[in-house]
Amino acid sequence: MSNTSTRWSPERAWKWYNGRPWFRGCNYLPSDCCNRIAMWQALDFETHLETIDRELALAASIGYNSIRVILEYPVFEQEHDSFPGRFERFLVTASKHGISVMVCFGNDCTV
């Protein structure tokens, strides 16, 4: 498939953009995480996910509809088999509260 057949026209892009609500949100790190690595590593993830669920419910209740998170490469590097599952659970939790997620990829220089 060529790039031109899948590329949106400017009109289609504006129609999509104008049909979306205004983004209201924040850069997100759970209150029980000391840094971005702690948010994603397997250690204590279940506890962090409970906190995330509670905090995203609160965020939605005050009108937030979007958050930005940073995925840290060192966690993926060390836990590459289990990390995608944790990330998916995070996305499902955000979606449950009507919150979209802007993902930023960290690298090994951001530690």
State the predicted function of each range.
Residues S2-V111:
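Active-site mouth of glycoside hydrolases
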